[in-house]
Protein backbone atom coordinates (compact mmCIF):
# COMPACT_ATOMS: atom_id res chain seq x y z
CA UNK A 1 0.00 0.00 0.00
CA UNK A 2 1.36 3.43 -0.96
CA UNK A 3 2.28 5.73 1.92
CA UNK A 4 0.26 8.84 1.16
CA UNK A 5 2.57 10.97 3.27
CA UNK A 6 5.46 10.28 0.90
CA UNK A 7 3.56 9.97 -2.38
CA UNK A 8 4.64 12.62 -4.86
CA UNK A 9 2.18 14.36 -7.14
CA UNK A 10 2.54 14.03 -10.89
CA UNK A 11 4.24 17.03 -12.47
CA UNK A 12 3.02 17.56 -16.03
CA UNK A 13 5.83 17.46 -18.61
CA UNK A 14 5.43 19.60 -21.73
CA UNK A 15 7.87 19.46 -24.65
CA UNK A 16 8.42 22.57 -26.76
CA UNK A 17 10.01 21.96 -30.15
CA UNK A 18 10.47 23.63 -33.50
CA UNK A 19 13.06 24.91 -35.98
CA UNK A 20 16.02 27.09 -35.02
CA UNK A 21 14.89 30.68 -34.44
CA UNK A 22 11.15 29.98 -34.48
CA UNK A 23 10.72 31.51 -31.02
CA UNK A 24 10.65 28.51 -28.68
CA UNK A 25 12.64 30.30 -26.00
CA UNK A 26 10.61 33.48 -26.44
CA UNK A 27 7.37 31.53 -26.00
CA UNK A 28 8.66 30.10 -22.72
CA UNK A 29 9.74 33.56 -21.57
CA UNK A 30 6.34 35.13 -22.20
CA UNK A 31 4.10 32.34 -20.92
CA UNK A 32 6.03 31.73 -17.69
CA UNK A 33 5.02 34.99 -15.93
CA UNK A 34 1.39 34.41 -16.90
CA UNK A 35 1.45 30.84 -15.59
CA UNK A 36 2.94 32.06 -12.31
CA UNK A 37 0.34 34.83 -12.05
CA UNK A 38 -2.34 32.17 -12.45
CA UNK A 39 -0.92 30.13 -9.58
CA UNK A 40 1.02 27.55 -11.62
CA UNK A 41 4.50 26.59 -10.38
CA UNK A 42 6.72 25.97 -13.45
CA UNK A 43 10.15 24.47 -14.03
CA UNK A 44 12.16 24.93 -17.22
CA UNK A 45 14.73 22.73 -19.00
CA UNK A 46 16.42 23.94 -22.18
CA UNK A 47 18.51 21.95 -24.66
CA UNK A 48 21.52 23.11 -26.66
CA UNK A 49 24.02 20.93 -28.47
CA UNK A 50 27.32 22.34 -27.14
CA UNK A 51 26.30 25.19 -24.81
CA UNK A 52 23.66 26.11 -22.24
CA UNK A 53 23.03 29.49 -23.86
CA UNK A 54 19.23 29.22 -23.93
CA UNK A 55 19.14 28.54 -20.19
CA UNK A 56 21.33 31.58 -19.56
CA UNK A 57 19.03 33.70 -21.73
CA UNK A 58 15.91 32.50 -19.92
CA UNK A 59 17.52 33.17 -16.53
CA UNK A 60 18.31 36.74 -17.58
CA UNK A 61 14.82 37.36 -18.93
CA UNK A 62 12.99 35.80 -15.98
CA UNK A 63 15.24 37.24 -13.26
CA UNK A 64 13.03 38.22 -10.34
CA UNK A 65 10.14 36.18 -11.77
CA UNK A 66 11.37 32.58 -11.50
CA UNK A 67 14.16 31.32 -9.25
CA UNK A 68 17.29 30.58 -11.32
CA UNK A 69 17.54 27.15 -9.70
CA UNK A 70 14.29 26.23 -11.43
CA UNK A 71 15.86 26.76 -14.87
CA UNK A 72 18.28 24.07 -16.06
CA UNK A 73 20.33 23.88 -19.26
CA UNK A 74 21.18 20.50 -20.80
CA UNK A 75 24.16 20.28 -23.16
CA UNK A 76 23.08 17.32 -25.27
CA UNK A 77 26.09 16.94 -27.57
CA UNK A 78 23.76 15.25 -30.05
CA UNK A 79 21.16 15.83 -32.74
CA UNK A 80 18.23 17.69 -31.13
CA UNK A 81 15.59 15.08 -31.92
CA UNK A 82 17.81 12.27 -30.63
CA UNK A 83 17.96 13.97 -27.23
CA UNK A 84 14.17 14.18 -26.90
CA UNK A 85 13.03 11.11 -28.83
CA UNK A 86 15.43 8.26 -29.72
CA UNK A 87 17.56 8.56 -26.58
CA UNK A 88 16.05 11.07 -24.15
CA UNK A 89 18.01 9.69 -21.18
CA UNK A 90 19.88 12.95 -20.48
CA UNK A 91 16.64 14.90 -20.46
CA UNK A 92 14.81 12.30 -18.39
CA UNK A 93 17.64 12.48 -15.84
CA UNK A 94 17.34 16.29 -15.81
CA UNK A 95 13.57 16.11 -15.40
CA UNK A 96 13.83 13.63 -12.54
CA UNK A 97 16.45 15.81 -10.84
CA UNK A 98 14.21 18.88 -11.06
CA UNK A 99 11.15 16.93 -9.88
CA UNK A 100 13.13 15.64 -6.91
CA UNK A 101 14.33 19.12 -5.97
CA UNK A 102 11.01 20.90 -6.51
CA UNK A 103 8.22 18.37 -5.86
CA UNK A 104 5.67 21.13 -5.29
CA UNK A 105 5.87 22.15 -8.97
CA UNK A 106 2.93 21.77 -11.34
CA UNK A 107 4.58 21.88 -14.74
CA UNK A 108 7.96 21.32 -16.35
CA UNK A 109 8.69 22.72 -19.81
CA UNK A 110 11.37 20.95 -21.86
CA UNK A 111 12.64 22.99 -24.80
CA UNK A 112 14.39 20.97 -27.48
CA UNK A 113 17.25 22.27 -29.54
CA UNK A 114 16.19 23.74 -32.88
CA UNK A 115 15.43 21.03 -35.44
CA UNK A 116 13.38 20.26 -38.54
CA UNK A 117 9.73 19.32 -39.05
CA UNK A 118 10.32 15.69 -38.03
CA UNK A 119 10.99 16.53 -34.37
CA UNK A 120 8.66 14.85 -31.89
CA UNK A 121 9.04 13.99 -28.21
CA UNK A 122 9.27 10.53 -26.69
CA UNK A 123 6.23 9.79 -24.49
CA UNK A 124 8.77 8.67 -21.88
CA UNK A 125 9.91 12.30 -21.68
CA UNK A 126 6.86 14.49 -22.36
CA UNK A 127 3.16 14.07 -21.64
CA UNK A 128 2.27 16.68 -24.29
CA UNK A 129 4.21 18.80 -26.73
CA UNK A 130 3.93 22.14 -28.46
CA UNK A 131 5.51 22.73 -31.86
CA UNK A 132 6.53 26.28 -32.81
CA UNK A 133 6.96 27.54 -36.37
CA UNK A 134 7.33 31.14 -37.47
CA UNK A 135 5.91 33.11 -40.35
CA UNK A 136 9.36 34.16 -41.58
CA UNK A 137 10.10 30.55 -42.51
CA UNK A 138 7.61 30.96 -45.33
CA UNK A 139 3.92 30.66 -46.04
CA UNK A 140 4.38 27.09 -47.28
CA UNK A 141 5.64 25.65 -43.97
CA UNK A 142 2.29 24.13 -42.86
CA UNK A 143 1.93 22.43 -46.27
CA UNK A 144 5.24 20.66 -45.76
CA UNK A 145 3.62 18.50 -43.07
CA UNK A 146 6.20 16.67 -40.97
CA UNK A 147 5.39 14.70 -37.82
CA UNK A 148 6.39 17.52 -35.48
CA UNK A 149 3.99 19.98 -37.03
CA UNK A 150 1.15 17.53 -37.65
CA UNK A 151 1.19 15.50 -34.41
CA UNK A 152 1.86 18.27 -31.87
CA UNK A 153 -0.81 18.75 -29.23
CA UNK A 154 -0.68 22.48 -29.99
CA UNK A 155 0.86 24.15 -33.04
CA UNK A 156 2.07 27.72 -32.52
CA UNK A 157 2.44 29.93 -35.61
CA UNK A 158 4.72 32.62 -34.22
CA UNK A 159 6.02 36.05 -35.34
CA UNK A 160 2.82 36.89 -37.18
CA UNK A 161 3.87 40.55 -37.31
CA UNK A 162 6.48 39.60 -39.92
CA UNK A 163 3.92 38.33 -42.45
CA UNK A 164 3.77 41.52 -44.58
CA UNK A 165 7.56 41.74 -44.69
CA UNK A 166 8.09 38.23 -46.04
CA UNK A 167 5.05 38.10 -48.31
CA UNK A 168 3.24 35.48 -46.24
CA UNK A 169 -0.53 35.24 -46.00
CA UNK A 170 -1.77 34.31 -42.54
CA UNK A 171 -5.08 33.24 -44.08
CA UNK A 172 -3.26 30.75 -46.31
CA UNK A 173 -1.16 29.46 -43.40
CA UNK A 174 -4.28 28.97 -41.28
CA UNK A 175 -6.12 27.24 -44.11
CA UNK A 176 -3.20 24.87 -44.77
CA UNK A 177 -2.83 24.20 -41.05
CA UNK A 178 -6.47 23.11 -40.81
CA UNK A 179 -5.95 20.74 -43.76
CA UNK A 180 -2.84 19.02 -42.37
CA UNK A 181 -3.85 19.04 -38.68
CA UNK A 182 -7.57 18.44 -38.88
CA UNK A 183 -9.15 19.31 -35.54
CA UNK A 184 -5.88 19.55 -33.63
CA UNK A 185 -5.52 23.01 -32.04
CA UNK A 186 -3.25 25.78 -33.28
CA UNK A 187 -2.76 29.43 -32.41
CA UNK A 188 -1.17 32.51 -33.97
CA UNK A 189 1.17 34.47 -31.70
CA UNK A 190 3.36 37.55 -31.46
CA UNK A 191 5.67 37.43 -28.45
CA UNK A 192 6.55 41.12 -28.72
CA UNK A 193 2.97 42.41 -28.49
CA UNK A 194 1.53 39.49 -26.54
CA UNK A 195 -1.03 38.68 -29.21
CA UNK A 196 -2.29 35.13 -28.71
CA UNK A 197 -0.17 34.51 -25.60
CA UNK A 198 -2.95 34.60 -22.99
CA UNK A 199 -4.97 32.30 -25.23
CA UNK A 200 -2.01 29.91 -25.49
CA UNK A 201 -1.79 29.79 -21.70
CA UNK A 202 -5.55 29.12 -21.58
CA UNK A 203 -5.00 26.13 -23.88
CA UNK A 204 -2.11 24.81 -21.79
CA UNK A 205 -4.10 25.08 -18.57
CA UNK A 206 -7.25 23.56 -20.00
CA UNK A 207 -5.79 20.81 -22.20
CA UNK A 208 -2.54 19.91 -20.40
CA UNK A 209 -3.16 20.81 -16.74
CA UNK A 210 -6.92 20.15 -16.89
CA UNK A 211 -7.52 23.34 -14.94
CA UNK A 212 -10.66 25.45 -15.20
CA UNK A 213 -10.01 28.58 -17.23
CA UNK A 214 -12.09 31.45 -15.88
CA UNK A 215 -13.75 33.39 -18.71
CA UNK A 216 -12.70 37.02 -18.98
CA UNK A 217 -14.88 39.20 -16.78
CA UNK A 218 -16.15 36.30 -14.64
CA UNK A 219 -15.88 36.92 -10.92
CA UNK A 220 -13.96 34.40 -8.83
Swiss-Prot record:
<keyword id="KW-0996">Nickel insertion</keyword>
<feature type="binding site">
    <location>
        <begin position="18"/>
        <end position="25"/>
    </location>
    <ligand>
        <name>GTP</name>
    </ligand>
</feature>
<dbReference type="GO" id="GO:0005525">
    <property type="term" value="F:GTP binding"/>
</dbReference>
<dbReference type="InterPro" id="IPR027417">
    <property type="entry name" value="P-loop_NTPase"/>
</dbReference>
<keyword id="KW-0143">Chaperone</keyword>
<dbReference type="GO" id="GO:0005737">
    <property type="term" value="C:cytoplasm"/>
</dbReference>
<dbReference type="InterPro" id="IPR004400">
    <property type="entry name" value="UreG"/>
</dbReference>
<dbReference type="InterPro" id="IPR003495">
    <property type="entry name" value="CobW/HypB/UreG_nucleotide-bd"/>
</dbReference>
<dbReference type="GO" id="GO:0003924">
    <property type="term" value="F:GTPase activity"/>
</dbReference>
<comment type="subunit">
    <text>Homodimer. UreD, UreF and UreG form a complex that acts as a GTP-hydrolysis-dependent molecular chaperone, activating the urease apoprotein by helping to assemble the nickel containing metallocenter of UreC. The UreE protein probably delivers the nickel.</text>
</comment>
<dbReference type="GO" id="GO:0043419">
    <property type="term" value="P:urea catabolic process"/>
</dbReference>
<keyword id="KW-0963">Cytoplasm</keyword>
<dbReference type="GO" id="GO:0016151">
    <property type="term" value="F:nickel cation binding"/>
</dbReference>
<comment type="function">
    <text>Facilitates the functional incorporation of the urease nickel metallocenter. This process requires GTP hydrolysis, probably effectuated by UreG.</text>
</comment>
<keyword id="KW-0547">Nucleotide-binding</keyword>
<keyword id="KW-0342">GTP-binding</keyword>
<comment type="similarity">
    <text>Belongs to the SIMIBI class G3E GTPase family. UreG subfamily.</text>
</comment>
<protein>
    <recommendedName>
        <fullName>Urease accessory protein UreG</fullName>
    </recommendedName>
</protein>
<dbReference type="Pfam" id="PF02492">
    <property type="entry name" value="cobW"/>
</dbReference>
Amino acid sequence: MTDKSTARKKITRIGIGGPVGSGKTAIIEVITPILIKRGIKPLIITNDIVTTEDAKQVKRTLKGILDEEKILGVETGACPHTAVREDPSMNIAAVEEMEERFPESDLIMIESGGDNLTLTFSPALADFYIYVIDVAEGEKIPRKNGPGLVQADILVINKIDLAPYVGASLDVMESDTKVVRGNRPYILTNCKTGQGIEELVDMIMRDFLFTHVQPEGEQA
